[in-house]
Amino acid sequence: MSDAQQITLLVDGEETKVTTGTTGAELFFERRDVVVARVNGELKDLDQELPEGAEVEGVTIESPDGLNVLRHSTAHVMAQAVQQLRPDAKLGIGPYITDGFYFDFDVAEPFTPEDLKTLEKMMQKIINQNQKFVRRVVSEDEAREAMKNEPYKLELLGKKNEAAEAGEGVNVEVGAGDITIYDNVERKEGTTVWCDLCRGPHLPNTKLISNAFALTRSSSAYWLGNQKNQQLQRIYGTAWPTKDALKAYQERIAEAERRDHRKLGSELDLFSFPDELGSGLPVFHPKGGIIRKEMEDYSRQRHVEAGYEFVYTPHITKGHLYEVSGHLDWYKEGMFPAMHVDAELNEDGTVRKPGQDYYLKPMNCPMHNLIFRSRGRSYRELPLRLFEFGSVYRYEKSGVVHGLTRVRGMTQDDAHIYCTREQMKEELTKTLTFVLDLLKDYGLNDFYLELSTKDPEKYVGEDAAWEEATRTLAEVAQESGLELVPDPGGAAFYGPKISVQAKDALGRTWQMSTIQLDFNLPERFELEFQAADGSRQRPVMIHRALFGSVERFMGVLTEHYAGAFPAWLAPVQVVGIPVAETFNEYMFDVVDQLKAAGIRAEVDTSSDRFPKKIRTASKDKIPFVLIAGGDDAEAGAVSFRFRDGSQDNGVPVAEAVKRITEAVRNRTS
């Protein structure tokens, strides 16, 4: 073989010579787990020829990118099945998403659960046919001819040059580079049985999907995510490399449903969402109020120890405040509409005194700036750390409101720190350490950090200030030793931020605390302090919310603990259950001793039989159940029954009180 017939590739880090025209499938022929190739950093179908000098890496089906391709290909199979079941269905967009995929369809009737079962069977037939996914590069005219009966695809072709901004999922179908169509080709006859406008890549064939997939639900969705557009029907699904992986995922989903804080909030009588109040406006019941109070009280204690000063600000303000801050320019869509008040009219209807617009506050920072500006400040006062459990109101679309984790009225544990530029990095480091330590005290221990940087279309201030702020935040994050993940364009309009991402007991990631560095609002509010040399200087401002919001954090903790809160947070920490009514008085005496020690304890004196009382305490997820019968009363003891069903019998009352109070004080149970 002559050199002219060969090309050199860098394959998985090693230089390799292959024949000109070699495809990824040929290169990785012996590696059956490879489903696509990464060529010079881009994912490519295995049947594409590899260019001279390319860096090539085999991507396995179990890798993150391989899973995405698997799920995207499964979405195509589902769409093929839908158009077999309903030939008049028009195709929308069908991308992969976290743990699965979806596809949108314009259909006359919504899909039913029975439809999804039928579609799964049809999909399995398609998969078993081992159809090939074949990429075809076409001109725009050819694409329009192929998609002439698909109006939504034709619309996408018109958005090719604006795919990144055109709407939800558009860049899955069209974008920079060639226009491509993927054909599903029947193997025996070699005929195309279905096709879709798509950028790919895809699996080599449907057989690789196997039977490890499921359609999970259907819902409505607006075309391109825009409420002004046609409402379509969306089918969600999931796909995994093996049946065992699918089963494990389904078990995680089932456990997540059991832990759903909305369900547990109702079952445990913690909170509710009355229709009379409106969407996203929860109320906390007495038991939920106890948990919330304990969360807030401990946070207050830790903030005092860390040198924060407490402030309070009103719920509404004149609109001018948010003109100064920039919120009305950059955040108005997230605010409730203005209330126009204080106008005075003459008898003839003419205006004697113009009114003013007032707004429910979406953020506390402008008001904290007014506190800083209320008098002269010296460098000796800095860093000044202001803290507030501040109620804020944000207009979330009704479709995204979700229990406690996405509300319209919330309480932020909001701090704003004012410091000199010289203090900036040390203060950021202290703040991050404080945040992580406090989250650990609430039972979250698995973290990584995300660095959100400037959105070039939506920011205020000088580029140099943004660059300095971003660089400093990155240094602090890297020095923490935690993984740092970039979030390009994710910052608020006034400054970059670090967000702490925490994993719960199910391994799900939640955004918790945010730490934001801001040179811009001090400029807009003309904040100043007198420096050591007598000059007037601008402070640096650090925004920090630890819980994010109290409501959201409580929702996360409810699911993290599956409602079985540690004893220090539990609404009822101890339930005493006498084995018979004869021992009620003895148990009341034990509970009185616990109450005197600050423990939330009660006696179950209901008419239920003893086994039912035990089941009730278990259902209510009580941390400590104390049982007393004749032997216990005679010995001055009680028996412990724990959440896992284990018992510790004959514990002296004084020892029982000590154990419980220590567990609560040390937050160990």
Swiss-Prot record:
Aminoacyl-tRNA synthetase listed as a keyword: yes
Protein's UniProt keywords contain Transmembrane: no
UniProt-listed GO biological process terms: threonyl-tRNA aminoacylation
Cell compartments where the protein resides: Cytoplasm
Binding site for Zn(2+): 365, 416, 543
InterPro entries cross-referenced by the UniProt entry: aa-tRNA-synt_IIb, aa-tRNA-synth_II, aa-tRNA-synth_II/BPL/LPL, Anticodon-bd, Anticodon-bd_dom_sf, TGS, Thr-tRNA-ligase_IIa, Thr/Ala-tRNA-synth_IIc_edit
Similarity annotation: Belongs to the class-II aminoacyl-tRNA synthetase family.
UniProt protein name: Threonine--tRNA ligase
Lineage, broadest ranks: Bacteria, Bacillati, Actinomycetota, Actinomycetes, Micrococcales
